[in-house]
Amino acid sequence: ADSCVLFVEAHGATMLFPGDIPARAELQLIASGSLPEQIDILVAAHHGSDTSSSQTFIDRVDPEHTVFTTKQANRFNHPSPRVLARYQKSGGALWDTGRHGAMCFRKRPARNLSATAMRIGYLPYWAK
């Protein structure tokens, strides 16, 4: 599969957006040597489907936060329970946009990265 992979480093935080790359492309990305030691924010490849997120890749990028871009009650059952279990094993925070809504990450000098889920604690105007 052809997919755009984007790595961003800003304000002391690292973010990786692997698009829809399959597990074999994850291994190629690791072999390229272009990844930093640890990723702060990872958007899970292919919405957390079984085609991506190999244990080797997860162990290598060691994400502090992983975001699964899904739709509430999606028909594909993303993220896959097997993929979710692999990320849970890594110990980082897991976020699902289908459940948590939009995500806001903030990095301030000399502070840890903070995450805010817009669907938790923020009610839309019609729900107030």
Question: What do the PLM-derived regions correspond to, one by one?
Answer:
Residues 72-128:
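Binuclear metal-ion centers of metallo-dependent hydrolases, dominated by the metallo-beta-lactamase
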Residues 1-79:
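Active-site-proximal loop/helix segments of hydrolase catalytic cores
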